[in-house]
Every structure is written in C-alpha cells, then in structure tokens.
Amino acid sequence: MTLFISDSIFSSTEKKGVDFDKAFAGYIVVENGLIQKVGKGDAPESLKSQAEKIIDARGKTITAGLVDAHTHLVHGGSREHELAMKLAGKTYLEIHASGGGIFSTVRATRAASKEELTQKALTSLDRMLIHGTTTAESKSGYGLDMETEIKCLEINSYLNKNHPIDIVSTYMGAHATPPEFKDNKEGYIKFMIEEVMPEVKKRGLAEFSDAFCEDKIFSVEETERIMKAAADLGFKLKLHADEIIPLKGAELAAKMNAHSAEHLMAISDEGITALAKSGTVAVLLPATSFFLMSPIYAPAKKMIEEGVRVALATDYNPGSSPTENLQMAMWAACYKMKLLPAQILRGVTINAAYAIDREKTIGSIEEGKQADLVIFDAPNIDFLVYHFGVNSVDQVWKKGKLVAEKGRLVYKN
C-alpha cells in the first residue's frame, strides 16, 4: 500500500457535497493499482504504519492523471517546411489545397514502415508521459486507404499494450478525400462505409469513429451519412466540427449523440445550446489556435456558462499542433481563453475522461478509480498555470506505479 500526502489535492470529483473547484489538504491510499481511500486532513497514524511507501508531496499539488482526449499520434514525417507559408499568411485550407497539409502527412505515413511509425509514436508517448499525460486518444486518418488505416490502428493496439499510457483508438478515415479519389468523393465515402469501417470493426481496432465536417472537406450531409454508418456498426462517435466555418457541425454532433465535438472555434450560439442539451463534450484545442497564429479561440467561457462540459486537448499532429505537452494547452486555455485554473484542470481530467467514455475509471481522484496521479511541483493550482513555459511535473504514477519523475522516464515494460 502506498500513501500519498499533500496539502493541495485537486480531485476533479463530481460527488455531491464536494467543492470540486478547490484543492484540499489530505491523503490518498493506493493499493493494487486502485485508489482505495481519499481523506481530508492528516492521515491517521494507523495508515502511516501500514504503508509500504509514503509519498510526502506537501508543498506540491496532486491531480488525477492528465487525459489527452484528442491526438493524431500515429503519423509519418513532420511539416516544419509549412511554417514559412503560415508566416506568409497562407491559411490552413490554402496549404491543404496546394497539396500540403494533410496530404503531405498522408504521403509520409503511407511510405513509412510499421516499425518506423511505431517507434515515432512511442517517442511521442514518452514525451506525453513526462508532461503528465496518462491516457490519450489516438486517431487514424493519415492513411486514407485500407492498408495504411489498418496499419495505424494496429499500432494503436500495440501501443496500448506496450506503453504505460492507455490508448483509446479512433478510426478517422473521413479526415480528407485521398488523391486516388480526387474527383470522386462519393466513391470514397462508399469505400469507407462499405469496406474500411466494417473491416476495422471486425478486427476490433477502434472504439470510436471521427469525421472532419468542414467546408471543402466533408459537408454536414456527407458527415451525417458517415456517422450513421459508423453508429450502425457499433462505433461510438466523435466529430471535428465548426473549426473554420460555422457549418452547424456542433448541432450534428448533438443530434447524433456523439461523445464529443472537437475544435469548435467557429461554433454558433445554437451549437452551444445543442451541446449543452445533448451532453456532448466540447473538446477544445487552444494549442492549435496558438500554433496557427490565429486570433480565434473556441468560446470556452460561454460554453461553460451555458452548461457545456468542456475538455482541453493537445490536438497533437504534425501540421497544426506539433506538441505532445498537454500543459501547453492548459497555458493557452488560461491566457487566451481566460479560463480559471480549476476549469482548466477539470478540462484535462474528468471532462476529458467523459470525452473518451472513461469517466467511470479515470479522470478524478476517487475511491475505486485507477490510481493515475500526477504530482506537480506547484504549491497550489493557480501556480500550476501561472508558472508557464516549464514542465511542472514532479512525478507521474500510472495504476499505482511510478512511471516518470523530474522529466525522466522510470517505467519498465
């Protein structure tokens, strides 16, 4: 049994009667990979005497393990050559239309071997881990053909079994229409619905299905067909929605009872109302707006005020958010979206867990949940986002085991 002691525990719990927006002084008992007890005040001497290990985190803050609910983890290559285009004022869609953007990464991902893609993803997961992430969603969508989509999803499965971070796998063939279907989007939609999605489901390679509902990518009508087909096959649903143009993607996500609608920089007031009513989680990606040098951020405060559950994620990908550090999204949420530290922490713990259907097992410090914990070298939650630009993680614990400490990996497979 391991006993954690701290004068700043932010539990992210949603239990009635608990002030979930404040940290408290207390203790956490961990045994067999699970949280056995959470208490306020001093730990009883009986617990201290029974503990095999006592982690004294006084002067530091303990949170639940961070959950990155939106990543494009498995991909080939990088796109630093596009930075000059962005600095020259080229938009995301202009770069995409010129053969760059997603298609650049599709070519690199198709050309890379399974071993190369796996090693690249493992390196990224290690970076995520030392910055506090203990669970991550991972989308395909840089293959767009049967072979490469399956390859990337098989890598997700391998990563989930061979790295401390738990991986939640998402099929996202509807990321773009590939070159071989350039003038035949309808043919590509049929290919996904009739061939790829059934094969992915048969092999058990993805829990969720996602699609990019955007001008010149997939229309609302096309996206709805894809989502209905995915739901009929038994996939849970996610949606890239209202990222650049307000197409009523959020309303579609709510209509389809999707677990999450993601991006949402161009969401309408009606879209916000729809998400609040449906319970669909808004997964917001402030690091993406930052990297794209955009002045437009999703209206996070308004969403929260209207009752939308808001999560925050990195959107880790080579084109619009090349960072594995979820703390970057936290800082951007504070300084660009004006969210409070408690709102931010809930966004990367319990709300993010809801976005990937894991709220019953992770995302908060509660009895019976998985013992995924992060100890931050911060005396309180305000300091955690106030002291920006550094890795504030002191220790990362996964299922009750120490896996990273002071920027170093200490896990053993």
Swiss-Prot record:
<feature type="binding site">
    <location>
        <position position="320"/>
    </location>
    <ligand>
        <name>4-imidazolone-5-propanoate</name>
    </ligand>
</feature>
<keyword id="KW-0479">Metal-binding</keyword>
<feature type="binding site">
    <location>
        <position position="317"/>
    </location>
    <ligand>
        <name>N-formimidoyl-L-glutamate</name>
    </ligand>
</feature>
<dbReference type="Pfam" id="PF01979">
    <property type="entry name" value="Amidohydro_1"/>
</dbReference>
<dbReference type="GO" id="GO:0005737">
    <property type="term" value="C:cytoplasm"/>
</dbReference>
<feature type="binding site">
    <location>
        <position position="72"/>
    </location>
    <ligand>
        <name>Zn(2+)</name>
    </ligand>
</feature>
<keyword id="KW-0378">Hydrolase</keyword>
<feature type="binding site">
    <location>
        <position position="72"/>
    </location>
    <ligand>
        <name>Fe(3+)</name>
    </ligand>
</feature>
<keyword id="KW-0408">Iron</keyword>
<protein>
    <recommendedName>
        <fullName>Imidazolonepropionase</fullName>
        <ecNumber>3.5.2.7</ecNumber>
    </recommendedName>
</protein>
<keyword id="KW-0963">Cytoplasm</keyword>
<feature type="binding site">
    <location>
        <position position="79"/>
    </location>
    <ligand>
        <name>4-imidazolone-5-propanoate</name>
    </ligand>
</feature>
<feature type="binding site">
    <location>
        <position position="240"/>
    </location>
    <ligand>
        <name>Fe(3+)</name>
    </ligand>
</feature>
<keyword id="KW-0369">Histidine metabolism</keyword>
<feature type="binding site">
    <location>
        <position position="142"/>
    </location>
    <ligand>
        <name>N-formimidoyl-L-glutamate</name>
    </ligand>
</feature>
<dbReference type="GO" id="GO:0019557">
    <property type="term" value="P:L-histidine catabolic process to glutamate and formate"/>
</dbReference>
<dbReference type="InterPro" id="IPR032466">
    <property type="entry name" value="Metal_Hydrolase"/>
</dbReference>
<comment type="similarity">
    <text>Belongs to the metallo-dependent hydrolases superfamily. HutI family.</text>
</comment>
<dbReference type="GO" id="GO:0008270">
    <property type="term" value="F:zinc ion binding"/>
</dbReference>
<dbReference type="InterPro" id="IPR005920">
    <property type="entry name" value="HutI"/>
</dbReference>
<dbReference type="InterPro" id="IPR006680">
    <property type="entry name" value="Amidohydro-rel"/>
</dbReference>
<feature type="binding site">
    <location>
        <position position="315"/>
    </location>
    <ligand>
        <name>Fe(3+)</name>
    </ligand>
</feature>
<feature type="binding site">
    <location>
        <position position="319"/>
    </location>
    <ligand>
        <name>N-formimidoyl-L-glutamate</name>
    </ligand>
</feature>
<dbReference type="GO" id="GO:0019556">
    <property type="term" value="P:L-histidine catabolic process to glutamate and formamide"/>
</dbReference>
<feature type="binding site">
    <location>
        <position position="315"/>
    </location>
    <ligand>
        <name>Zn(2+)</name>
    </ligand>
</feature>
<feature type="binding site">
    <location>
        <position position="175"/>
    </location>
    <ligand>
        <name>4-imidazolone-5-propanoate</name>
    </ligand>
</feature>
<dbReference type="GO" id="GO:0005506">
    <property type="term" value="F:iron ion binding"/>
</dbReference>
<feature type="binding site">
    <location>
        <position position="70"/>
    </location>
    <ligand>
        <name>Zn(2+)</name>
    </ligand>
</feature>
<comment type="function">
    <text>Catalyzes the hydrolytic cleavage of the carbon-nitrogen bond in imidazolone-5-propanoate to yield N-formimidoyl-L-glutamate. It is the third step in the universal histidine degradation pathway.</text>
</comment>
<feature type="binding site">
    <location>
        <position position="240"/>
    </location>
    <ligand>
        <name>Zn(2+)</name>
    </ligand>
</feature>
<feature type="binding site">
    <location>
        <position position="243"/>
    </location>
    <ligand>
        <name>4-imidazolone-5-propanoate</name>
    </ligand>
</feature>
<dbReference type="GO" id="GO:0050480">
    <property type="term" value="F:imidazolonepropionase activity"/>
</dbReference>
<feature type="binding site">
    <location>
        <position position="70"/>
    </location>
    <ligand>
        <name>Fe(3+)</name>
    </ligand>
</feature>
<feature type="binding site">
    <location>
        <position position="142"/>
    </location>
    <ligand>
        <name>4-imidazolone-5-propanoate</name>
    </ligand>
</feature>
<keyword id="KW-0862">Zinc</keyword>
<dbReference type="InterPro" id="IPR011059">
    <property type="entry name" value="Metal-dep_hydrolase_composite"/>
</dbReference>
<comment type="pathway">
    <text>Amino-acid degradation; L-histidine degradation into L-glutamate; N-formimidoyl-L-glutamate from L-histidine: step 3/3.</text>
</comment>
